[in-house]
A protein has these predicted regions:
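Extended, low-complexity cationic-aromatic segments
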Residues: 1-57, 153-156
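A short alpha/beta connector and helix-capping loop motif
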Residues: 1-16, 81-97, 116
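Short, conserved catalytic/metal-binding motifs centered on acidic residues
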Residues: 29, 55, 71-75, 104, ...
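RNase H-like DDE/DDD metal-dependent nuclease/strand-transfer catalytic core used by mobile genetic elements
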Residues: 50-96
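RNase H-like two-metal-ion nuclease catalytic core shared by retroviral integrases
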Residues: 72-73, 80, 94-118
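C-terminal anion-handling pockets and recognition modules
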Residues: 106-160
């Protein structure tokens, strides 16, 4: 991860020349009341095959029986194979209304995870994975309860 901010003399742009193009990492996981579950990191942008693999190998086994899975409207979430696998396992899928990140408590968890991972300034793949693991573990049940409470408040209090 590279610095998000820099310094330069007044009136000049801060420029950082990277020696190489950094590897993109994709972090995926789920949340239920009281816990985060099924974390996985890929050293690339996630593909539809990765999404299905995560559903089959990680998510379904981590869910309690007859869970309701609420997803946002990311195109990959509509993958028929993944949706069928979830339904065959006895779970229900619901989709949020479009453009509603304020109603999605996991967005607050992602914010904390990314902030903590960036804050440790990892250099290299091993250190980045360790930073992500530590950040993931830092999301407490109390945090999660707060994220769900905030989501409910956002849903019922119009913003003027």
């Amino acid at each position: 991860m590279h610095p998000r901010y820099g310094y330069a003399p007044k009136g000049q742009r801060a420029v950082v020349k990277l020696k190489s193009r950094p590897t993109r990492y994709t972090l995926i996981g789920a949340m239920r009341i009281g816990s985060m579950l099924a974390p996985r990191v890929w050293p690339r942008a996630m593909t539809a095959d990765d999404w299905v693999r995560w559903i089959l190998e990680d998510l379904i086994s981590a869910l309690k029986p007859r869970s309701i899975i609420i997803m946002d409207n990311l195109n990959i979430h509509y993958n028929g194979y993944a949706l069928d696998a979830i339904k065959e396992a006895g779970h229900t899928v619901l989709f949020q209304s479009r453009y509603s990140p304020d109603f999605n408590p996991i967005e607050m968890a992602w914010s904390k995870i990314k902030t903590l991972a960036r804050g440790s300034r990892p250099r290299g793949a091993k250190l980045l994975r360790a930073a992500i693991t530590d950040a993931w573990s830092a999301v407490t049940p109390r945090d999660i309860d707060g994220y769900f409470s905030q989501t409910i408040e956002n849903a019922w209090q119009p913003k003027c």
